[in-house]
Amino acid sequence: QEENKNFSEVGIQTHTESLKDSLNYFTKELQFDVVNPASDESLDLTKDKLSSYDGLIWGGSSLNIYNDTPEIRKQIDFMKECQKKVKKILAICWGMQVAVTAAGGEIKKADGSHIGIASEITINDAGLNHPIYKGKDIKFNSPAFNFDEVKTLPNNAICLASNKINKVQSTYFEVND
């Protein structure tokens, strides 16, 4: 919540606003509900209707999951609910850290960082066969501000891409109850 306020006060889009604009650039057919699980007062109402969503996109944040604050624990708990009730989840950056942690994986401070761009992300064999990378060049760059990385993947998770800084730039896994 404070991070969003700080962005807005200096005229910068929040992560959520930027993500919505990016998606709307490609299609106007999506409908969005925005939830901030760290501070949303009506989170219990949102949990009740999770299974009605076609999918969920969980974007970035400047938080570090290993700091284990009440705000972070609330997000992990909400992600666990999402993993039970939402069939398709695209978890980007911080979202991947929350999803991996909620599913039993572990995040640590990375040995390096991405400031603005994650360079030379390389899709591995598993990634080349995954629909998210259909038609994508085997090496690519992506916008990123990242200081942390996946240390341990959840059970049944597959790494899809990596680079020199992060051994896991992308992963796929299913959560079973």
Q: Language-model features: where?
A:
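Pocket-forming structural segment of enzyme catalytic cores
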Residues: G105-D177
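N-terminal beta1-alpha1 cap of cysteine-dependent amidohydrolase-like domains
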Residues: Q1-D77, E81-K87
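Short glycine-/acidic-enriched loop or helix-start segments at secondary-structure transitions
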Residues: N6, N67-D68, V100-A102, P154, ...
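A structural signal for short, well-ordered beta-strand segments and their strand-loop junctions
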Residues: V34, L90-I92, C159-A161
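Active-site phosphate/pyrophosphate- and oxyanion-stabilizing loops and adjacent acidic/basic residues
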Residues: E17-D21, Q97, F147-D148
